[in-house]
Design a protein with these regions (language model features):
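Hydrophobic, aromatic-rich transmembrane alpha-helices
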Residues: 194-198, 256-280, 284-288, 333
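Extracytoplasmic catalytic/substrate-binding loops of multi-pass membrane glycan-assembly enzymes
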Residues: 44-57, 69-81, 91-94, 232
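Perimembrane helix-loop-helix junctions
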Residues: 10, 163, 188-215, 241-242, ...
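Loop-to-helix entry region of an early transmembrane alpha helix in multi-pass inner-membrane enzymes
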Residues: 76-80, 90-106, 140, 303
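Transmembrane alpha-helix segments characteristic
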Residues: 25, 29-33, 131, 176, ...
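Transmembrane-helix motifs of polytopic, lipid-linked glycan transferases
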Residues: 98-118, 156
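Membrane-lumen/periplasm interface segments of specific transmembrane helices
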Residues: 37-38, 55, 206-268, 289-293, ...
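Short acidic/glycine- and proline-prone juxtamembrane loop motifs at membrane-interface regions
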Residues: 136-147, 302
Length: 363
């Protein structure tokens, strides 16, 4: 009897230990079930597609029926997927109105799995939950469009590049190309991640594999669109004007877009602990380059342009909290870190180059 009670007690302790170990995974699953229900509820209320969604549906019809594209400058991937579904089910926008939500939900799962492996379950859940409940992301993911689709391939690219397997880097190249096919200008974001990871790994063979995979997909997309439309255009002319005078639009509206969490981003960028872990570098570059790119547009500023780099914003926000908890905020150490970093860069530059009497730098 005593032995049975001991075994039961031990078994109960093991169950509790497992529940404690996987508590954030359980919370994540519960959160995701709630999220899926919210998507289902809001999508079921839609009676007509938004303007952009209507044209993606028209383009899908044109691809399916071999007619000229209504708007040939729109990225083709979402229309190809819809056309593929319609070839089986018949044409009905109701069948595909929840399509983008599937990609957004999948992006969150991939993000959680990646961050859980490298940063822990609590960190992963925090970043993923903040990303998934982001207002712009949720709203546009309930529509027929490309925001969630492009986010999915950006996150999937990040996932593949964080692995050192050659096959994963080739797949990363393909997902970069699919990001291009999803939403043309968003290709910049996985490219930035790719460049950062390439500099960290320093493995030319992996880089070449990624480039080959990327070119394979991009050339296929360009050729197919060109053969269909007789031309290839990535955007309207009015949306392609850029300037070095960066607009403050996204910074001014940052609290409306990302909430109070955005206030933590500068802390993460300035804190020296952020730069100890090379895993963070891709997220830093992802955020900075994306923000500067969209701020450099001379006229077209939209909240939905921030969706694809929202994970980077919340990653840095949560990282700032982690830095404060573990190291605190020490202004002197932060200033010293940046002072030493700048001095180190200047010294390495001076060692590499010499200034000749003619006023030119030379090696």
């Amino acid at each position: 009897m005593a032995l049975e009670n001991y075994n039961k007690s031990r078994k109960n302790k093991n169950i509790l230990a497992r529940l404690s170990r996987y508590k954030f995974d359980i919370i994540f699953i519960i959160f995701y079930l709630f999220l899926i229900y919210q998507y289902y509820y809001h999508i079921s209320l839609l009676y007509v597609p938004i303007h952009d969604g209507a044209y993606y549906l028209l383009n899908a019809h044109d691809w399916l029926t071999n007619k000229p594209l209504d708007e040939f400058y729109r990225p083709p991937l979402i229309s190809w997927i819809i056309a593929g579904i319609w070839s089986i089910t018949g044409e009905s926008w109701v069948i595909v109105k929840g399509l983008q939500a599937i990609f957004t939900i999948s992006a969150g799962i991939i993000l959680y799995v990646l961050l859980r492996k490298h940063k822990g379950a609590m960190f992963a859940f925090s970043v993923t939950a903040l990303t998934m409940v982001s207002g712009p992301l949720f709203f546009f993911s309930t529509q027929i469009g490309t925001e969630g689709l492009a986010l999915f391939f950006v996150v999937l690219t990040l996932y593949f590049l964080k692995n050192q397997k050659a096959s994963h880097w080739f797949l990363a190249g393909m997902t970069i190309g699919l990001t291009f096919a999803s939403r043309y200008p968003i290709i910049l974001q996985p490219l930035v991640i790719f460049i950062v990871e390439s500099l960290i790994t320093k493995k030319p063979k992996l880089v070449i594999r990624t480039i080959l995979g990327m070119l394979l997909v991009i050339l296929t997309v360009v050729i197919m669109v060109y053969l269909k439309a007789g031309t290839f255009q990535t955007a309207l002319a009015k949306d392609t004007a850029f300037t070095l005078l960066f607009s403050p639009y996204y910074l001014i509206n940052s609290l409306d877009i990302w909430g109070l969490a955005f206030l933590l981003v500068p802390i993460a960028l300035l804190h020296e602990r952020t730069y100890r872990d090379k895993f963070n570098y891709a997220f830093i570059a992802w955020f900075i380059v994306s923000l500067l790119f969209w701020s450099a547009n001379s006229s077209n500023f939209q909240v939905r342009f921030t969706i694809q780099y929202t994970p980077a914003v919340y990653f840095l926000s949560v990282l700032a909290i982690e830095n404060i908890i573990k190291d605190g905020i020490t202004i002197n150490n932060t200033i010293l870190f940046w002072y030493n970093s700048i001095n180190s860069y200047i010294k390495s530059f001076k060692d590499k180059y010499k200034y000749n009497i003619l006023g030119h730098w030379e090696k």
